[in-house]
Amino acid sequence: ESITNTDRPGLQALIKNSGLTGKTVSSTNVSFTIVPRINAVGRLGLSEKSVSLLLTEDYDEAAEISSQLCVDNSERQEIERDILEKIDGIIRRKPSLVNDKIIVIDGENWHQGVIGLIAAKVKEAYGKPVIVISKLGDIAKGSGRSVEGFPLCDAVFACSDLLTHRGGHPMAVGLSLDSENIPAFRRKINEFADNFGKMPYDKINIECKLNPAYINLDLIDSLSLMQPYGAGNPTPVFGLYNMTLKNITPLSANRHLRLTLSRNNIQITAMKFFTSTEEFPYKIGETLDLAVNLDRNEFNGNVSVSVIVKDIKSSDCDTEKLLDSRTNYEDFCRGKQLDRSQLSDLMPDRNDFALLYRYLKSNGGYAFETATLVHMLDNRLSFGKIKVILEAMRELRLIEISEGMKTSKISVLPVNGRVDLESAPIIKKLREVF
């Protein structure tokens, strides 16, 4: 309320330039619209602009600085997109990087003010601790983000002999080291993770299951009593289960999606930001589970409920089983000894090969996250088994595969004659240890 009714010229100008004039400023608006503009200039090394904006008593000066902050924030976003594209390319060229328990990715001259934000986004994509390192000649600086339950600072401190500076807390770290020590650092920090025990995955804490019939402005008004949200008081996340997908509408040049969903004749719309139709694997008619935030949306004087999708999965997906299977595959790739049940989870037979190959051929390949293939094949193959088959088919030149942060591109190649599936190196390796 104090921000909505502020008499500070800087905040007034920033509210106007953020498109919030005449609206009630919520903690969500502050977190995702106002604060990023203030933080952006600090990340770009121009923090004096934010200080001047907040201290000025002159509205004209505030309006000018606020406009600059919006431009700087757009520049920060462009820098982030550029680095994320480079990281996606690195992962596509060397997919084994993401088999590590702690993902360590490095690049040349990445802007050090944003690598922490980048680490957080890569962590969201893979559900693992991530450290992003920027090399500036012989010196490198890194920033990391962890998942709940894994003390990333302890892992970093265990590598102190390779570092020139380090600091942080269980969920975030910063560090410096000589560029030549990055490979040794990657190995050593993953040795720490290997000795840690079962690694936790990133997770979303659901406050409660929500009946879509109760999504209305009265609920939003009740939730507003818990604001402001932030550190120590996170925005509540609700679970919408067994929702039927009715329609998919691309927005903003296909950068975002509006989903129409229903259950028991109750229909709602939900926003899936930063996802295009090409990246969305689900089809109309499928039954989905969603983790969502709820907020008030004000537009042209109309007030409605905004449902924002944080994550989405098929209702028939056994997430724990899928993650355990992913761990089995990654441990196998890293040479870790597996027991017989874990190996059985990975070992395919000819029928398994045929099932996946027929699916890929009949659909002209595949262009979504590999994990969603489990659902597309009606849970007949485990995630680990799918990964083994894909790698075997790649080795035998049956397919080409490029796996990035958000999507996998699988293309079926022309084949002459019969192919001996048992000759694939990954199958031979599995047979040896089985």
Predicted regions and their residues:
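Mid-to-C-terminal polyanion-binding domains and interfaces
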Residues: 61-65, 71-105, 158-434
